[in-house]
From Swiss-Prot:
Name of a matching Pfam family: Proton_antipo_M
The reaction(s) this protein catalyses: a plastoquinone + NADH + (n+1) H(+)(in) = a plastoquinol + NAD(+) + n H(+)(out); a plastoquinone + NADPH + (n+1) H(+)(in) = a plastoquinol + NADP(+) + n H(+)(out)
Domain of life per record: Bacteria
InterPro entries xrefs: NADH_Q_OxRdtase_chain4, NADH_Q_OxRdtase_chainM/4, NADH_UbQ_OxRdtase, ND/Mrp_TM
Name of the protein in its database record: NAD(P)H-quinone oxidoreductase chain 4 1
Keywords: Membrane, NAD, NADP, Plastoquinone, Quinone, Thylakoid, Translocase, Transmembrane, Transmembrane helix
One of the record's GO molecular function terms: ubiquinone binding
Organism of provenance: Synechococcus elongatus (strain ATCC 33912 / PCC 7942 / FACHB-805) (Anacystis nidulans R2)
Transmembrane segments: 6-26, 37-57, 87-107, 113-133, 137-157, 169-189, 209-229, 243-263, 277-297, 311-331, 332-352, 376-396, 417-437, 461-481
Task performed by this protein: NDH-1 shuttles electrons from NAD(P)H, via FMN and iron-sulfur (Fe-S) centers, to quinones in the respiratory chain. The immediate electron acceptor for the enzyme in this species is believed to be plastoquinone. Couples the redox reaction to proton translocation (for every two electrons transferred, four hydrogen ions are translocated across the cytoplasmic membrane), and thus conserves the redox energy in a proton gradient.
Length: 533
């Protein structure tokens, strides 16, 4: 970081964290002052990141930008090292938008409002730090930091089984985090030099066995967060018990941390191991797509149904990452952004319905369309986006993943079977989502829910619109987002493809048939992203 450069990323991370500290001292009995204070901080931080990226981020540059690096704990080689590139910058903006809207969605929280908003702001900063950290140990620390607020948000403000869901969440994620630490230390100590810096780790020459073991460790850790089968079982319980703002953050941001980390660590740091593991990712992606969709059918709890839908949609992220090419990576990243908006909207609207009906059991809810026509319209549009209706962001992202995998270097048989099985998910998704809409909003109204149910309020309309407008905008003009990371994903795909001929030769070309494209890629090599000071 040069002396002339303002530490924008540090400011974006520390603003919500430091602003959370005085919340316990704010004189406020009913939580009104704390709500407005928290909302102001969220908006200010979101505005700060929009301004910083607008002024200082160059989308034509593939490498790291806005780099900040300060020695923090030199005794252990820990640096406060931050940067963004095309992979992380869109996810930082997604974090700012969804977290700010989650603050607005929590307006009716009256139980311990000071603690609630303190945790939201702490989580806000920790999530941004995960997407911007460029030091392995710093990444591990902020990855762990976000676990505590999420645990408390579920255990204090969740449903009847909140303690079970929160404990399951913390056990899964905390134990999985140990794999990050062990794999990170193994890479840091490898070779003649010791370093936690991700750029330096990307330049090291690892033995194949070390790469494979580190890749497996990272895959387990990030697979838990991404809810890869069979590491997913914490997610339906967490969503089923968390309140609406908590579910918005779980689905909108936390799942994306797993997908982002898979690309940043498994693909970028360990490209040769990724080539050997990628077929496994493709198979796991198919399992996620079909397993999640089938389980969504079986759920009578509205939020658990949406949770299994999220598991299914994350399968497309795995397929995109497994495709070896820039189109697949583009699709994976676009799917993360799209799902972050759509899932946050679905869980928010589920919370709107719950506040009126006081139940999440779909058999107890029917005929809400006449009582809540605006909510019905919003729910319908969001469900259409989730089932990948053309004109919505979900359609573009899933189509891009399909095209990327179709153009991959796998054998024609493997590609054909994978695409056909993934298409099953495209058939199942509208079936369970349209069935959900029919059961909730059509039929005879259940009078036990009350004589009259209030429709969505202006505040709730605003939250829904802020999530749906970018969903529609990306669907009609995907370049709004893809132009941000096209250069980065192209360079990253070239780095992976440069290892394809060697691996294919070692495996006798059993899965890899389109070798001319891979051999052409060997002319391009990106051992680590360039750094801009």
């Amino acid at each position: 970081m040069t002396s002339e450069q303002f530490p924008w990323l540090t400011g974006i991370i520390l603003l919500p964290i430091l602003a959370a500290l005085p919340i316990p001292l704010i004189p406020d009995k009913d939580g009104r002052t704390v709500r407005w204070y928290s909302l102001f901080v969220g908006l200010a931080d979101f505005a700060l990141m929009v301004y910083a990226f607008w002024q200082h981020f160059d989308r034509s540059e593939a490498g790291l930008q806005m780099v900040e690096k300060i020695s923090w704990v030199p005794q252990i080689g820990l640096n406060w090292s931050l940067a963004v590139d095309g992979l992380s910058m869109p996810l930082v903006l997604l974090t700012g938008l969804v977290t700010t809207l989650a603050i607005l969605a929590s307006w009716n929280i009256n139980v311990k409002p000071k603690l609630f908003h303190f945790l939201l702001l702490l989580l806000y900063g920790a999530q941004i730090a995960v997407f911007t950290a460029q030091d392995m140990m710093l990444f591990f620390l902020v990855w762990e930091l976000e676990l505590v607020p999420v645990y408390l948000l579920i255990s204090i403000w969740g449903g009847p089984k909140r303690q079970y869901a929160a404990t399951k969440f913390i056990l899964y994620t905390a134990l999985a985090s140990l794999f990050i630490l062990v794999a990170g230390l193994a890479l840091a100590f490898s070779g003649d030099s010791f370093s936690f810096d991700l750029t330096e780790l990307g330049l090291k020459d690892y033995s194949l066995w070390l790469e494979l073991l580190a890749y497996a460790g990272f895959l387990i850790a990030f697979g838990v967060k991404l809810s890869i089968f069979p590491l997913h079982t914490w997610l339906p319980d967490a969503h089923g018990e968390a309140n609406a703002p908590g579910s918005m953050l779980l689905a909108g941001i936390l799942l994306k941390m797993g997908g982002y980390a898979l690309i940043r660590f498994n693909v970028q740091l360990l490209p040769e191991a990724h080539i050997r593991f990628a077929p496994v990712l493709a198979v796991l992606g198919i399992v996620n797509i079909i397993y999640g969709a089938l389980n969504a059918f079986a759920q009578d709890n509205l939020k658990r149904k949406i949770a299994y839908s999220s598991i299914s949609h994350m399968g497309f992220v795995l397929l995109g990452i497994a495709a070896y090419n820039s189109l697949g990576l583009n699709g994976a990243l676009l799917q993360m952004l799209s799902h972050g908006l759509i899932a946050a909207a679905l869980f928010f609207l589920a919370g709107v319905a719950y506040e009126r009906t006081h139940t999440l059991q779909i058999p107890q809810i029917s005929g809400l369309a006449k009582q809540m026509p605006i909510t019905f319209a919003l729910f319908t549009v969001t469900a259409m986006a989730s089932l990948a209706l053309p004109g919505m962001s979900g359609f573009v992202s899933e189509l891009t993943v399909f095209l990327g995998f179709t153009d991959s270097v796998y054998s024609s048989g493997f590609r054909t079977v994978t695409i056909l099985l993934a298409a099953v998910g495209l058939v199942l998704t509208p079936m369970y989502l349209l069935s959900m809409l029919r059961r909730i909003f059509y039929g005879t109204y259940n009078i036990q829910l009350g004589q009259v149910l209030a429709d969505a309020k202006p505040r709730e309309l605003f939250v829904a619109f802020c999530l749906l407008v970018p969903t529609l905008a990306i669907g009609f003009y995907p370049k709004l987002t893809t132009q941000v990371y096209d250069v980065t994903t192209t360079a990253l795909a070239a780095q992976v493809q440069s290892n394809l001929p060697v691996v294919a030769l070692a495996q006798q070309g059993s899965l890899y048939s389109q070798m001319p494209a891979a051999e052409e890629a060997t002319a391009v090599s990106m051992t680590a992203p360039p750094v801009i000071d």
